[in-house]
Amino acid sequence: MKFTQMAHANEIKRDWIVVDATDKVFGRIITEVATILRGKNKPCFTPNVDCGDFVVIINASKAKFSGKKLESKNYFTHSGYFGSTKTHKMSEMFEKNPEKLYKLATRGMLPKTTLGKEMLKKLKVYAGSEHPHTAQIKG
């Protein structure tokens, strides 16, 4: 009788995947990236093991948005002090720091556990086409 093989953390082989965000819809990029970071595209996927790959997003500032999200969507921050709630429009965040916007959106699609935080560390986002990870990427 055969049993299901479970992946172990020391057996996982991680690849580096480059995603070019030029003229792609923001949400579709994020769902693709979250699937790769989680490892759900691999046959050895195990929910309690971080079996995802590293993802490098380049040209992050050239993505498109569907609908009127840039004007209508707001992000809230709070420092912990009374009355310190701040609201930022998505368009402001995308102009100032697109890397943070990608990380926030991807974090929302990953598990809210320590495993999810480890998965998010494997995401590298760059606004331009240059990145320092060319040595790790094959092909």
Curated annotation (Swiss-Prot):
CDD domains registered for this protein in UniProt: Ribosomal_L13
Keywords linked to the UniProt accession: Ribonucleoprotein, Ribosomal protein
UniProt-listed PANTHER family: LARGE RIBOSOMAL SUBUNIT PROTEIN UL13M, RIBOSOMAL PROTEIN L13
HAMAP family: Ribosomal_uL13
Protein family: Belongs to the universal ribosomal protein uL13 family.
Role description: This protein is one of the early assembly proteins of the 50S ribosomal subunit, although it is not seen to bind rRNA by itself. It is important during the early stages of 50S assembly.
Protein name (Swiss-Prot/TrEMBL): Large ribosomal subunit protein uL13
Native organism: Aliarcobacter butzleri (strain RM4018)
Lineage: Bacteria, Pseudomonadati, Campylobacterota, Epsilonproteobacteria, Campylobacterales
